[in-house]
Amino acid sequence: MISTANSDSITPHPKGIHARVLLSSVFGPYARDDEFGSRAINPMELYHNQVTRAQGSFSLRMFHRSWGLMMIQRNISAPSTLLDFPTLERFEREITSTQYDVVGISGIIPNFGKVREMCRIVRKLSPNSTIIIGGHVAAIPALDKLIDADYVVRGEGIAWMRRYLGEDPAAPITHPEILSGFGMRVLGMRIPDKTRDTAATIIPSVGCAMGCNFCTTSAFFGGKGKTCNFYESGDELFRVMEHMEQSMKVSSFFMMDENFLLNRPRAMQLLDCMKKAGKSWSLYVFSSANAIRKYTIEELVQLGVSWIWLGLESPKSSYAKLHNTDTHVLASELRQHGIKLLGSTIVGLEHHTPENIRQEIEFAVGHGTDFHQFMLYTPVPGTPLFQQMQDEGRMLDGIDLADIHGQFKFNFEHAAISRDESKRLLDWAFRFDFERNGPSLFRICDTIFQGWKKYHNHPDLRVRQRVANEAAKLRTTYDAALWAMEKRLKKTNFAVSVRIRELRREIEHEFGGATRLVRAITGPILLWTSRREDRRLARGKTYEPPTFVDRRNWAT
């Protein structure tokens, strides 16, 4: 049965909040090609998957927990287990060691094969369990006819699960404590998972009101003009963040909201609370260009905006979020004020041709953002673009769902660019960005240093503290990393190596002899580990997340 959070067709489970619930992400391993839809090109790593994948040992490697499942588990009263990144054997062991009344499985569309296999296993080993499927995989048309599940849930899952367990779907949301990332590696070095150095994830809302035709998130949560706010006001958001600060010992927050700055009243309320409490927090946000322009630079700096994921898409696209904005000027201005940017560009829009596409990619790379994501224009089930392409008869036959993720080849017939050429163009875009702008780690250091120079004497103590916190690593490990990158690139990309050297020397001049001493000791180590890492990667080395088991509300 296809269902949504507001569906009247939900029949509550007879055991209500006494039902035993298992929530699980799809099974690993992930970074390999297999019969269940895993792909080596599509590892369980957001950055290395679709942002820094051409940067070798300089690539930022990390994993992220299944935040949606964590939100659901924290907001139901039933005894529950969350199994995150299990192996197939671990999943089987869990459903045979405990008799679960409900098994909820979450995945994305490329995970279809794994979701289907997990449903088969539950039916075999725990036949009395109710199977619920959620996440973006639920957008596949007629998914309930393709897999053996009782419910396929589209949209927001907390309210749905509460309703199913006989609880109030409109009860206030309790936010779980979530570290934004773990298992970080760069230059071949494993970075310890220290909470003080890692942002906490806050999810203020789901969905996006902009409603871009390709956007799976917007479509999944109601489409254009629709969002589901968990926290309506800046006051509510502040209380959640203050709790995280105290319990997790963090001072930075990753705001998992598709367009956080679009809700200006909420953001300004939050700023007012931060000022009154003297909070020197760093915020990592998603935003559109039109939303950013609602603020002055001083407001962004006061709010603690330290990093923005910015949709650039294409200079000739018609998306409302880009109207009347010179994105080159905007990107340069933000970075000059210490705000790091992750630009996102689409390859293969309708107007792209073999004659103009490289020029557009060069335009994108010219923004000089700290990171750059390139994604193929991809009609994903559930989106307006998918419906349009179906209506026009342009969806390609025989494309495996496991390959519909925007990082491989077109899944539709483009007017001017072939399926194979789409992959060559995408791969070139990542390589060109790396060759032109250098490692993202170098760019981050540059932006942080620009922010330090501009604001370390700012009259507001909160701002001074924040930029000092963000610049602290420039004095130590980041400077050493710059030296290692400079040496590694001297023979292969001399122009970028020179730029890195110039930045390093300026940093050492600013911060003095102690910084040079740390670089002299640590730099050669990072040079060696980065070379070792590139040798490992050349031999096919991959990384997988460990399995997490979280249990709540079980009687002792």
Model feature map: region roles:
Residues 1-46, 95-96, 101, 128, ...:
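Radical SAM enzyme core and accessory elements
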Residues 23, 105, 133, 255-257, ...:
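Conserved beta-strand positions
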Residues 144-161, 297, 302-308, 359-374:
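Structural recognition of alpha->loop->beta junctions
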Residues 184-342, 347-349, 355-358, 362:
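Radical SAM [4Fe-4S] cluster-binding motif and immediate context
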